[in-house]
Amino acid sequence: MAEHPAPAGTSVITSLPDVSELPELGFSGWKSWFGEAARAVLRWTPAPGLVLFFQSDIRESGEWVDKGYLVQRAAEAEGRRLLWHKVVCRRPPGTISHGRASYSHLLCFAHEPRARITHPGPDVLPDAGYKPWSKAMGVDACRLACRFLREESETKLVVDPFCGHGTALAVANHYGFDALGVELSTRKVRAAKRLVLELDV
């Protein structure tokens, strides 16, 4: 990313890979990588662009891994401001889960704080929505993120540097944004190119 500066009007919607997707790093190596990757994404996004992270906590090696905290720590290191922190339910409230949290974090960071947000959206989303694949962000979560960008930012281009099957990109296109994804897996790239979502307004 450092070799390809972001154009003006860029914002990011992404979900950083889980340790299960990078087993070669080991747990401690993944935690270090996660923090550096989050910082790189935040650093790359130009003002007044926003960065939105969608992350799900896990239990690994007997400890709870709060990815929302890891992202916020990276943002503090880069001098970014947290505009909001929403919870997206992956399972109905009251569900007992083992290994992975039944909710996800959706966090929005900016270069500068904002005194007022006109269209804040809900703090808790009852369902992430349709997922084109198992690790997808969920269409409803993507819609919430894209709606906020449309109503509260100067965004023209949405970038997902870990795009997977391209859910965030497809929803961004639906909301009128140009969208660009980065993905190392050729299989996932092919899936992203094929993805078409039928969405209402």
Predicted feature descriptions by range:
Residues 1-3, 197-201:
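S-adenosyl-L-methionine
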Residues 1-182, 187:
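Core catalytic lobe of class I
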Residues 192-193:
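Conserved SAM-binding loop
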Residues 188-189, 201:
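Flexible mid-to-C-terminal extensions adjoining Fe-S/redox cofactors in radical SAM and related proteins
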